[in-house]
A protein has these predicted regions:
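Core catalytic alpha/beta fold that binds nucleotide/phospho-ligands
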Residues: 1-223
């Protein structure tokens, strides 16, 4: 029997997104490989490159943290499912939440960086290292609007400008069709360029250890 969906802790109108390094996520006290579903573990076991495996694991864990913050469920009850409409099979394709059919989820990973997003309606996230330069231009011209390619070519750093347009396009692609807003920013601390496309306004949060509880000590009456 499926447990009833719990009420969402937020206002239900704002998407949540987070970006982190793979190391930050794997060091989080509430996130670990044991949270993954059996089908996720099978896919993880098939990845031969250790760094890529860690990135995939961290992205899936970060998505659980986003879902937990959005829905009020703990991370161990925030597992996404995946389904591919093209081959009519589960285990891959666009992620979704069983208990919240109106909520969109998305994840991304690239070279030690991970991103995740959850929100009402469609949502997509993409993260890339700030030093990456997409190309070649002949390929980008088939993916990006011509106006974006021209604008990037005229920028002081065309490569950096193209990267920003690229992450926006990837986030939109993951979110799907519709009237989408795009929030794009550079996380200088992690040297990452991030974009979130969503039907609702989006906000971000920082991944890190939960703050230790504040201990109130009794006041010394002699002082």
């Amino acid at each position: 029997m499926t447990a009833p969906a719990r009420p969402m802790t937020g206002d239900g109108r704002t998407a949540l997104a987070a970006v982190a390094t793979t190391g930050e996520v794997l060091a989080h006290p509430r996130l670990h490989e044991g949270l993954l579903e059996p089908w996720e573990l099978r896919r993880l076991a098939a990845i031969r490159m250790p760094r890529r495996r860690d990135d995939v694991l961290a992205a899936r864990l970060l998505l659980r943290l986003c879902v937990a913050r959005f829905t009020g469920r703990p991370p161990e009850e925030s597992a996404p499912a995946q389904y591919c409409a093209d081959c009519d099979r589960p285990g891959h394709g666009r992620p979704y939440l069983h208990d919240h059919p109106g909520v969109g989820v998305s994840l991304s990973h690239a070279d030690g960086l991970v991103g995740a997003a959850v929100g009402p309606g469609a949502v997509g996230v993409d993260v890339e290292p700030a030093t990456r330069r997409p190309g070649p231009l002949s390929v980008l011209a088939r993916v990006l609007p011509e106006s974006a390619v021209r604008e990037a070519a005229d920028a002081p750093d065309p490569g950096a400008a193209l990267l920003r347009f690229w992450v926006r396009a990837e986030a939109r692609l993951k979110a799907g069709d519709g009237d989408l807003r795009v929030l794009e920013w550079t996380d200088r601390h992690r040297s990452a360029v991030v974009a979130v496309a969503s039907t609702a306004p989006a906000t971000t949060f920082t991944v890190g250890p939960e703050p230790a509880p504040r201990i109130r000590r009794p006041r010394d009456p002699t002082r």
